[in-house]
Swiss-Prot record:
It catalyses: a plastoquinone + NADH + (n+1) H(+)(in) = a plastoquinol + NAD(+) + n H(+)(out); a plastoquinone + NADPH + (n+1) H(+)(in) = a plastoquinol + NADP(+) + n H(+)(out). It comes from Crocosphaera subtropica (strain ATCC 51142 / BH68) (Cyanothece sp. (strain ATCC 51142)). Its EC number is 7.1.1.-. The gene is ndhO. Pfam families: NdhO. One of its GO terms (molecular function) is oxidoreductase activity, acting on NAD(P)H, quinone or similar compound as acceptor. Belongs to the complex I NdhO subunit family. This is NAD(P)H-quinone oxidoreductase subunit O. It is found in: Cellular thylakoid membrane. One of its GO terms (cellular component) is plasma membrane-derived thylakoid membrane.
Length: 72
């Protein structure tokens, strides 16, 4: 799945993978609905993480690549 994901791609957050992650356990696990109900665009990447911009007035967020799926 991560092989298809590249900078500029539209992605959706996989709820099950984010909710059960170490990151979720280390912070507030009440995620806003836009994370799962809308598409985001990858604006930056490194080996394991992608910076996602959602089209709502909120800051961009870094998420692990395995927590994302490409959308058309």
């Amino acid at each position: 799945m991560a092989a298809k994901i590249k900078k500029g791609a539209l992605v959706r957050v996989v709820k099950e993978k984010l909710e059960n992650s170490l990151e979720a356990k280390a912070s507030d696990s009440r995620f806003p609905s836009y994370l799962f109900d809308s598409k985001g665009e990858i604006i930056e990447m490194n080996d394991e993480y992608a910076l996602i911009r959602f089209y709502v007035p909120t800051p961009s967020v870094w998420l692990r690549l395995d927590q994302l799926e490409a959308v058309e």
